[in-house]
């Protein structure tokens, strides 16, 4: 059972990395980043439950990661919305505000 859950987490992580590398849309890149965070949460909770069943350290870290991911998503979507208002596009290759 442990191997199946860890392979699910690794599979989700790989899908997130692939999507993050190949996406040209900022919203899709944020979604892939959230998928990576969720894969880390799955593996963290799995390791916590399999190695230390008495304490809930993995679950506490997972809740902390979920809170950080929610803040990251809110800030990221606010940035995407501001860029869309200025450029009328959410494509990553058209985002050149930080270039010289």
UniProtKB/Swiss-Prot annotation:
Subunit structure, interactors included: NDH is composed of at least 16 different subunits, 5 of which are encoded in the nucleus.
EC category name: translocase
Gene: ndhE
Organism: Physcomitrium patens
Keyword Metal-binding: no
Bilayer disposition of the protein: Multi-pass membrane protein
Cross-referenced InterPro entries: NADH_UbQ_OxRdtase_chain4L/K, NUOK/Mnh_C1-like
Name listed for the protein in its UniProt record: NAD(P)H-quinone oxidoreductase subunit 4L, chloroplastic
Role noted for this protein: NDH shuttles electrons from NAD(P)H:plastoquinone, via FMN and iron-sulfur (Fe-S) centers, to quinones in the photosynthetic chain and possibly in a chloroplast respiratory chain. The immediate electron acceptor for the enzyme in this species is believed to be plastoquinone. Couples the redox reaction to proton translocation, and thus conserves the redox energy in a proton gradient.
Assigned EC number: 7.1.1.-
Keywords carried by this UniProt record: Chloroplast, Membrane, NAD, NADP, Plastid, Plastoquinone, Quinone, Thylakoid, Translocase, Transmembrane, Transmembrane helix, Transport
Catalysed reaction equations from the record: a plastoquinone + NADH + (n+1) H(+)(in) = a plastoquinol + NAD(+) + n H(+)(out); a plastoquinone + NADPH + (n+1) H(+)(in) = a plastoquinol + NADP(+) + n H(+)(out)
């Amino acid at each position: 059972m442990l191997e199946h859950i860890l392979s699910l987490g690794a599979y989700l992580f790989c899908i997130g990395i692939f999507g993050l590398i190949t996406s040209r849309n900022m919203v899709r890149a944020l979604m892939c980043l959230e998928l990576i965070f969720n894969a880390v949460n799955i593996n963290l909770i799995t390791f916590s439950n399999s190695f230390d069943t008495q304490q809930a350290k993995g679950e506490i870290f997972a809740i902390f990661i979920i809170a950080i991911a929610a803040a990251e998503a809110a800030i990221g979507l606010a940035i995407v919305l501001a860029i869309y208002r200025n450029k009328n596009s959410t494509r990553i290759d058209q985002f050149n505000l930080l270039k010289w």
